[in-house]
């Protein structure tokens, strides 16, 4: 059986280019699915406009079956906000789109187990669409329409934070498997962190709040910024 690290590595190339929050969510989905005995592979992440147009032509002006109704610019894949998945088979190299498969033999179809975890994280599922059902497709719109995205709009910091909050509970469970430590600022405990290989990890927001600083996430730059607030009477 493949290790979690091996399963994650198989999807690494296709996760490249995704919006940071979608990347975190897709990674969490791989981890949660693996934990219940359903390893998955991300088969598609970011898709360029040209690649989308070529896919749209399939079954229309090019050989093959129709697999999408979206032209270039009309898919969340084109903005790094969508990912497609398949079930990774026990041999570690083959995949399956069999929605009736129950490899972990728990009475629930593996495909739907993955979908349940995906929705809990905040993904929208293409299988819920009423017209063209796209069962491998998962996306996060962050409240933005495709028309919004075509004009250059980006997910807001608040929308991104909401996704992070949905992922956090499972991350905190994983945190407890490491060496738990109390993090203090000026003698006052502000949070529980964890120690791994000599490095202490703690939520940046807890540190900034304890220091009376402001914290902001800038999606376009994929940057978390902590800004200290000068004390009254301080000389700068």
Where are these regions (language model features)?
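Extended, low-complexity, intrinsically disordered C-terminal regulatory tails
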Residues: 30-64
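Catalytic cores and adjacent binding grooves of peptidoglycan-active enzymes
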Residues: 70-172
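Short aromatic/hydrophobic-glycine micro-motifs
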Residues: 38, 60, 122-126, 213
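Charged, often glycine-rich, active-site loop that binds/positions anionic groups
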Residues: 51-71, 137-147, 230-232
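Anion (oxyanion) recognition and catalysis
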Residues: 34, 119, 209
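Primary recognition of N-terminal secretory signal peptides and signal-anchoring hydrophobic helices
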Residues: 165-236
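Active-site acidic/histidine clusters and adjacent loop/turn architecture
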Residues: 1-44
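Soluble non-cytosolic domains of exported or imported proteins
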Residues: 16-24, 46-49, 104-112, 197-202
């Amino acid at each position: 059986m493949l290790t979690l690290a091996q399963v994650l590595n198989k999807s690494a190339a296709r996760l490249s280019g995704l919006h940071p929050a979608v990347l975190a969510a897709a990674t969490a989905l791989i981890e949660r699915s693996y934990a219940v005995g359903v390893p998955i592979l991300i088969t598609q992440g970011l898709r360029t406009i040209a690649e989308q147009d070529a896919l749209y032509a399939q079954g229309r002006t090019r050989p093959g079956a129709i697999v999408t109704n979206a032209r270039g610019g009309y898919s969340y894949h084109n903005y790094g906000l969508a990912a497609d998945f398949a079930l990774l088979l026990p041999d570690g190299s083959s995949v399956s789109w069999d929605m009736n498969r129950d490899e972990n033999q728990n009475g629930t179809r593996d495909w739907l187990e993955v979908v349940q975890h995906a929705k809990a994280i905040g993904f929208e599922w293409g299988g819920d669409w009423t017209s063209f059902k796209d069962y491998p497709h998962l996306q996060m719109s962050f409240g933005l329409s495709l028309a919004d995205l075509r004009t250059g709009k980006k997910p807001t910091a608040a929308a991104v934070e909401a996704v992070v909050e949905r992922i956090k509970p499972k991350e905190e469970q994983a945190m407890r498997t490491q060496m738990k430590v109390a993090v203090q600022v000026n003698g006052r405990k502000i949070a529980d962190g964890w120690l791994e290989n000599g490095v202490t990890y703690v939520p940046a927001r807890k540190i900034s709040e304890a220091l009376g600083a402001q914290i902001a996430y800038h999606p376009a730059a994929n940057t978390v910024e902590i800004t200290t607030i000068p004390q009254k009477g301080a000389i700068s």
